[in-house]
Structures are given as C-alpha cells and as structure tokens.
Amino acid sequence: MRLEVEARLRLGSFAIDAAFGSEGGVTALFGRSGSGKTSLVNIIAGLLRPDQGRVVLDGDTIADSERRLFTPVHRRRFAYVFQEARLFPHLSVRGNLAYGRWFAGAARSGPEFGRIVEMLGIGHLLDRMPSKLSGGERQRVAIGRALLAFPRLLLMDEPLAALDDARKAEILPYLERLRDETRIPIVYVSHSVAEVARLAERVVVMENGRVKASGKTAAVLNEPFPTSGPGRREAGALIEGIVDSHDEGHELTVVRAGDCLIRVPHLVAEPGQRLRLYIAARDVMLATRRPEGISALNVLPGTIVGLSSPRQGSIDVRVDCGGNVIAARVTTLSRDALDLRPGKQVHAVVKTVALDY
C-alpha cells in the first residue's frame, strides 16, 4: 500500500516543505526535536491543513490543495498513537479497547479482538483501570485501541519517548510483532536512531522542515561518512543478525552477525529470530592488538576499509568485521598514533551496555 505525501505549510517563522513516498511497512520520520516530524505527521492525520500539498494512500486522494479536497480527520480512517497513551481514565482496559471497536463495528472487530489482545500481551490487563498500568502497558493498550478501529494507516508520534529504558525494552518486541503480523502501513515518528534501526524498513530524515534524506533504512543509516543522513553525532552502523542464545545468568543475549557474536543486554526474542542492531560510532574504540583485561565484552577483529576527512579533531573509521561494517569515531591523534589506514587489521571494541535499547 503506497503512501504519497507532499506538504507546504508555514507555522509562524517555521515552514514545512517536504515530500516523501513509502511502500507500506514501517516508515520512520526521523530527526531532532523541532525538525518538523510531528507537524508533518499531523498534516497526514488531517490535524493540520497544508497551504499546498496532497496526501494519497493506495491511489485514494485524501487531501489535495489544488483540487480543494480535504477529507476530515474522522473520515480518513487513520489511527494515531501519541507520546502519552491518552486512555480514558474512567474506563477499564476492556472499555478503552471497546472504544476502538466501536469505530469498526462490533461484528467486524469481534474475531480480531482476541488476536490483537494476544499479540500485545494485554489479556491479563483487561479488567484493570489505566491508573493501575505501567507506562509501557498503557502504550500497549493505546496501540490495541488504535488497531481495533481497523485503520488504513497507523500514525505513531514518538510512542516510546515518555518511557524509561526498561519500559522501552518491554514494548519494542510488541512493536516488532505489530510490524511483522499486520499489513497496516505505519508512519513512525522518532528521534532515536536505535528505534528507527530496529523497527523501520524506510526512513525519512527531517531537518528544518525539509526532507534531508530518504530511502531504505540500511542505506540511509549506513551512509559511509554522513552528510545527509542521521547526522554526525548519531552516525554509526546498522547490523543485521539473528538471536543465537541467551545468557540468563547475566541477563545477556548473544546475537550472531555474519562471523561475529555480539553480546547485548537481554532481549525478549527467540533463538533464530532476525533483528537489527545500531552501533553508534561514538561507542566504538579501536585497538591494533586484541586488548586483555577489559570490561567490554565485544572485541571484534576486522579490517579498516575507509576513513573520513577530519572534522573538529576527529574522524570516522569504517571497519569490516566478519561481513558487517562498523564505524568508529576516533581523534586524529589516535589515527596518527595507531597508524590507522585502509587495509590495516584492528579490533573494534564495543561495550555491551552501549547497546541497551
């Protein structure tokens, strides 16, 4: 199901001038706070009316300024999950879910109720009130309510932003199931590279109200020396792998990525499950000999395949570690002291706790 968006809108001194297309699955709108992500998703939802532009979903024109066509919010059949769950405090979990069913009609949503409740792991919460739920539980209920409205498009505006790290880790597996088990296209707003890497098939990078880059997630996030991707501070590498095993005693998960085994904090995932990890360049150290007696658990042998130009006294070094290219940010002093150059054998050192998301 293809989504096409073109929008121009002035909001005081800030202007949106953006266009993108996606082919279903999860499309992430990524960028720093104030980049225009939420304004753009609100245009898609119909909460903001653009000065110029159009929104087309699967060939159906939802809005078109040239034709003076603007479908009201309640007729778009789009569902919106906000940063805060926004559950009705006077209704139980079951009552909140029933509100979503009301939009679709009880007969239509009846067979799906049990499947969605099971997929989101909220069956044991049905009789609780929102005040008795954790932040992660409230968001899962909000997602369930949205799904039970049978939307044509699901919009999610930073659904994990208000959660602490533990609650984020709790809810991410459910978002992966949502992505994998439903055919509903999703526009997912986030400023977290790790979330985007783990969930999205495509990413649209926003900056100052404009689209700075767009494409498949791996291509955008793995841009060798980013000038148009996620930005230098967030630069790194997306690694695809499978869950190899769990170390329950130490609450770790071992991920096999190419020829490498990478230890990460415990993930709720079955052995053999495919997943993606994002390793930020600023979290990687390089050593010319395998270091001993260090706390970092991931020491990955590899070969340097590229170095960026110096910027503010540092460079990004790309290292091929068993078929996966990892980026490391080091100072120019370290480059000279270690004689870092293409073809040199090194070890990339990554702290396990740096991969905690």
Swiss-Prot record:
ATP binds at residues 31-38. It comes from Rhizobium meliloti (strain 1021) (Ensifer meliloti). It is found in: Cell inner membrane. One of its GO terms (molecular function) is ABC-type molybdate transporter activity. It comes from the Bacteria. Belongs to the ABC transporter superfamily. Molybdate importer (TC 3.A.1.8) family. The complex is composed of two ATP-binding proteins (ModC), two transmembrane proteins (ModB) and a solute-binding protein (ModA). Keywords: ATP-binding, Cell inner membrane, Cell membrane, Membrane, Molybdenum, Nucleotide-binding, Translocase, Transport. Its EC number is 7.3.2.5. It is a peripheral membrane protein. Gene3D superfamilies: 2.40.50.100, P-loop containing nucleotide triphosphate hydrolases. InterPro entries: AAA+_ATPase, ABC_transporter-like_ATP-bd, ABC_transporter-like_CS, Mo/tungstate-bd_C_term_dom, ModC_ABC_ATP-bd, Molybdenum_import_ModC, Mop_domain, P-loop_NTPase. GO terms for cellular component: plasma membrane. Part of the ABC transporter complex ModABC involved in molybdenum import. Responsible for energy coupling to the transport system. The lineage of its organism: Bacteria, Pseudomonadati, Pseudomonadota, Alphaproteobacteria, Hyphomicrobiales. This is Molybdenum import ATP-binding protein ModC. Pfam families: ABC_tran, TOBE. Residues 293-357 form the Mop domain. Residues 1-233 form the ABC transporter domain.
